[in-house]
Amino acid sequence: MANLPDKDKLLRNFSRCGNWEEKYLYIIELGGQLPPLSAEMRTPDNRIAGCQSQVWIVLSTQADGSVQLYGDSDAAIVKGLIAMVFILYQGLTLAEIVAYDVRPFFDALALTQHLTPSRSQGLEAMVRGIRAQVAARQ
């Protein structure tokens, strides 16, 4: 996985941003830390429906049972939101992802109140898409 901060560090870094312009820049910076997604992974099966931007998320299960996520978007802020979702799920197993409710974390960041409705819907679509991929593997 990319060199992304853990959940606690993400919260700390986010709270250090002085205003929402800085927070958006931080979100974009997080997206820039995601490794490039290969053309082979940009398939219709990996495309997340319900996002205005093009979003691809690929899930692979590691030998230890944890999940590795790969993703990309054609929009910088959306790519940053992908990175934020990946931070929440990194190192979790399939069962842990299904059980984990990400909404309180996003509420703690006040994220959904500051995203456009289409980006908020896209964020929900990403979470649903990951959960659907997890359900297909269980």
UniProtKB/Swiss-Prot annotation:
One of its GO terms (biological process) is sulfur compound metabolic process. It is found in: Cytoplasm. Pathway: Cofactor biosynthesis; iron-sulfur cluster biosynthesis. Keywords: Cytoplasm. Pfam families: SufE. SUPFAM superfamilies: SufE/NifU. Its main location: cytoplasm. One of its GO terms (cellular component) is cytoplasm. The active site is at 51 (cysteine persulfide intermediate). Belongs to the SufE family. Homodimer. Interacts with SufS. Participates in cysteine desulfuration mediated by SufS. Cysteine desulfuration mobilizes sulfur from L-cysteine to yield L-alanine and constitutes an essential step in sulfur metabolism for biosynthesis of a variety of sulfur-containing biomolecules. Functions as a sulfur acceptor for SufS, by mediating the direct transfer of the sulfur atom from the S-sulfanylcysteine of SufS, an intermediate product of cysteine desulfuration process. This is Cysteine desulfuration protein SufE. It comes from Sodalis glossinidius (strain morsitans). The lineage of its organism: Bacteria, Pseudomonadati, Pseudomonadota, Gammaproteobacteria, Enterobacterales.
